[in-house]
C-alpha cells in the first residue's frame, strides 16, 4: 500500500470510528452536540452533554492492540492540547458549567464493526 492509500485508509478508519463512537455514546445517555471542533492549539473529536456537564471526548481508533490499547495513545501532549481546545470551546460557546473528559477507544473487528471502551474522567 502506498503512502497516499495508507493516509486515505487511516482517515476513513478515523471517520468511521468517530461515527461509531458517537453512536456508542448516545446509547449510554450522552447527547452529542458537536464534532470536529478545531482550535488554535488542539482538536476536539466529540463534544457531548451528560447531565449538567459538558464532556470533551477524544476518540482513538485502531486496527489492533498490537502496540497498546487506543486509550494508551493519549499521552501528556494530547491531554494538554485537549485542555487548551476545551478552554477555547468554553469561551466560544459561552459555556459556564463543568467540563469533564472522556476517551472512547475503538478497535476494528473483521466484520467491519468495532469493540468499544469508554473511559470517563481519564485524567484524574
Model-inferred region functions:
Residues 35-38, 43-44, 104-107:
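Short, solvent-exposed loop/turn elements at beta->coil junctions and helix N-caps
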Residues 8-16, 41, 65, 69-80, ...:
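Residues at secondary-structure transition points
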Residues 18, 43-45, 58, 78, ...:
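Acidic active-site catalytic centers that drive phospho-/nucleotidyl reactions
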Residues 92-124:
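Domain-level recognition of nuclease-like catalytic cores that cleave nucleotide substrates
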Residues 1-35:
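Acidic-basic catalytic patches of nuclease active cores, encompassing PD-(D/E)XK
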Residues 25, 44-70, 74, 82:
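Conserved catalytic cores of phosphodiester-cleaving nucleases, focusing on short active-site segments
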Residues 30, 35-38, 61-62, 68-81, ...:
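Amphipathic, hydrophobic secondary-structure cores in small proteins
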Amino acid at each position: 500500500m502506498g503512502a497516499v492509500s495508507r493516509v486515505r485508509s487511516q482517515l476513513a478508519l478515523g471517520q468511521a470510528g468517530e461515527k461509531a463512537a458517537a453512536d456508542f455514546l448516545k446509547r449510554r445517555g450522552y447527547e452529542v452536540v458537536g464534532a470536529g471542533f478545531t482550535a488554535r492549539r488542539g482538536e476536539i473529536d466529540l463534544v457531548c452533554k451528560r447531565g449538567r456537564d459538558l464532556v470533551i471526548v477524544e476518540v482513538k481508533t485502531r486496527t489492533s492492540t498490537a502496540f497498546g490499547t487506543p486509550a494508551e495513545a493519549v499521552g501528556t501532549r494530547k491531554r494538554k492540547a485537549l485542555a487548551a481546545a476545551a478552554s477555547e470551546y468554553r469561551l466560544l460557546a459561552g459555556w459556564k458549567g463543568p467540563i469533564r473528559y472522556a476517551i472512547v477507544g475503538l478497535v476494528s473487528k473483521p466484520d467491519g464493526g468495532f469493540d468499544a471502551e469508554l473511559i470517563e474522567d481519564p485524567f484524574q
